[in-house]
Amino acid sequence: MSSQEKHKPEYDSSGKEVNPYIPKFISAVPWYHNKSNDEKSDDYLSHQRSNVADEAKDHSIPQPGSGINDEFEIKGETEIKKVEDYDSKRDRWHGYEAQEWDKIAENWDKIKKKKQKTKNASVEEDSDDTDYELELVELGLDSKDIKNNLKEDPLEKTIRDRQDVPAYILNITSSNKIHYDPKSRLTKDPSKGFINDKNQFVKKLTGEAKRLDNLQKFAWEQNRQQEEMKQREAFEQKLTGKKHSEGGPDEYQVDLNLNMEANPTAMMLQARHKQEQQQASHDQKKSDLVAKYGGGEFLNKSKEFVNVTESIQTGDKPINKDKNGLKRSIYPEDNYSMNHQSIWGSYYSGGQWGYCCCKQTTRNSRCTLN
């Protein structure tokens, strides 16, 4: 490409060629330069002059009527001038009127009156007997106050049940210590339940309810194992390329024997059979360990160590606790010998034990008091 093609000449509006080597600060006339009409007509560089609209304006000089565009908002019967200055744009209550809230309050009052009418109608339909109402009038009470929990009903039952034992008494008499939860501020027995995430005391299941819950869990576990087995078989058939059995892969067959609600008797028998199998396997494992390592003679308790307190009897009843409810010793108590009125060890003096009745320190000696 030649140099002439690179630098093509430029022409102004009058058709004269523009010299590209003249700098801009020389060719361009500043905006503050006073121009005359003759200069404008003879100016061959007028196309490079700054536009009048782009020239800087002197705002210190008042210019009435320019740039004024007032906007008004008509609300109701008044005209409000719309002024969006810095503060009004950031005012959260700008344009708020109290009349809007009055309309909302009126709507709420209408809804409240409708509810009150329906409530009064239901109260009139389910009113109490005349004798009960007359008695309330004599006592200076109103049935509406009682229903709204403003006053206590004097005719309400106030006698406590005999079997209603306070929780603090149960905690004192029980072997477990009082358990206080500082988060929920509840004093509960942890053996009877627990406090959940919603700050509610949930009782543990006992008796028939616990057995039913265990049976339901057993049914769920059996159903889960069967589903896993079906999925494994379907995956193996897919790998081997075998076709599904009759009914197709989309047909789902439910085993009613694994449903607690459909067949509870069968589920109970299965659970019992499963428990017997586990117990048999446990006993077999235990016997194998004993046969391998020995020590079977220590598994069965000897008669010499079977509850020594039960062998110590007075008459036909075993002596386990005294009259105060305290646990007795394994040795005989209140068994006076050699005409003593106290037992050996009831007296101590000079580092020696003795009898409290005669102050003797020789054991199995006859009492000298009588």
Swiss-Prot record:
Q: Where in the cell is it found?
A: Nucleus
Q: Where is this region: Disordered?
A: 36-74
Q: Which keywords appear in this protein's UniProt record, sorted alphabetically?
A: mRNA processing, mRNA splicing, Nucleus, Spliceosome
InterPro entries, per database record: Slu7_dom (IPR021715), Splicing_factor_SLU7 (IPR039974)
Q: Listed GO molecular functions?
A: pre-mRNA 3'-splice site binding
A single GO cellular-component term on record: spliceosomal complex
Which coarse location class applies to the principal site listed for this UniProt protein? nucleus
- BP GO annotations: mRNA splicing, via spliceosome
Q: Where is the composition biased (Basic and acidic residues)?
A: 36-60
What family does this belong to?
Belongs to the SLU7 family.
Role noted for this protein: Involved in pre-mRNA splicing.
**Quaternary assembly:** Associated with the spliceosome.
Which PANTHER family does the record match to this protein?
A: PRE-MRNA-SPLICING FACTOR SLU7 (PTHR12942:SF2), STEP II SPLICING FACTOR SLU7 (PTHR12942)
What's the name of the protein?
Pre-mRNA-splicing factor SLU7
Tell me the lineage of the source organism: Eukaryota, Fungi, Dikarya, Ascomycota, Saccharomycotina
